[in-house]
Amino acid sequence: MKACFFRRYGGPEVLEYGEMPDPQPGSGEVVVRIHAASVNAADWKMRAGQYGAAVSFPHIPGRDFSGVVTKGGADFSEGDEVFGVCEVPREGAYAQKIAIREPIVARKPKDLTHAQCAAIALAGLTAVVSLEDTLKLERGETILVHGGAGGVAGFAIALARHLGAQVITTASASNHDYVRKLGAHRAIDYQSTDFTKVVNNVDAVLDTVGGDVTMRSFQVLRPGGRLATIAAGPTAPEASRSDVRSLRPNVRRDRPHLERVAALVTQRAVPLPAIVEYPLAEAAEAHRVSEGRHLRGKLVLRVL
């Protein structure tokens, strides 16, 4: 099969496009012919050796996908359209085929394209787990979402609005219209404004940026507030205050959460993100764009 893979850690240039062996399914697995795979920060962090989970070389990256079952199992039959999120550090979705456990695969909604399903799988899953399971965001609360134009943050903005929260987000000025359309009540230009000077006493923060943004965000929480970060490594950072909580979402890859993501989109509670597509053979260029961290929405690789 054709795939994009890397034989060593490094920059985007280490990604190769070529032939790899077809996957051999194990017990409880199905084989999926991938039509689309999305690009996530986790992909280039793994390629750069920054992810924490060791991989064997050559390694196929890619965490989420959408496609058609070619070898069925107990829950899915040949020809079923499905989408899902891969397990780390197993082989990923930058390939024409993947063998994957059935419990982490869900049926693709008929009114969504493969590119759209690939775009919402991991981003939506992360947002749902972060807001509903980890932060337990409630109606009437105020949340600050960092990096609002990104895939996870964009889904989180829309979900928070759907849950009845007041939503503040940070984004470049050029993306303010975009994040407002997603549901943000207020947008702050992080390039010209220090958010700690204009935000205070919020109930929750979702940090998708990391670095000093994480630690500075503790300043704007109310007493008893909570911060969830998906950008600070495998564990939550120690809070800079004793009266707030620091949390690290445990993003569970399972069918119920994938079905929740799909339902939010198909029921129009959450809009689809802006999508930029690249052919699978141009995954290296997609990684360069993703690493630039100025993307609006999601990058998707066309596999078929």
Task: State each model region's role.
Residues 117-189:
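Mid-domain Rossmann-like dinucleotide-binding core that forms the NAD(H)/NADP(H) cofactor-binding site
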Residues 269-273, 287-304:
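C-terminal capping/lid region of NAD(P)-dependent oxidoreductase domains
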Residues 197-204:
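A short acidic, Gly/Pro-enriched loop at the edge of an enzyme's catalytic core
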Residues 90, 208-271, 280, 303-304:
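Glycine-rich phosphate-binding loop and adjacent beta-alpha segment
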Residues 21-38, 48-89:
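Glycine-rich beta-strand-centered segment in the early N-terminal region that forms part
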Residues 89-102:
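A structural motif shared across PLP-dependent enzymes of the aminotransferase-like
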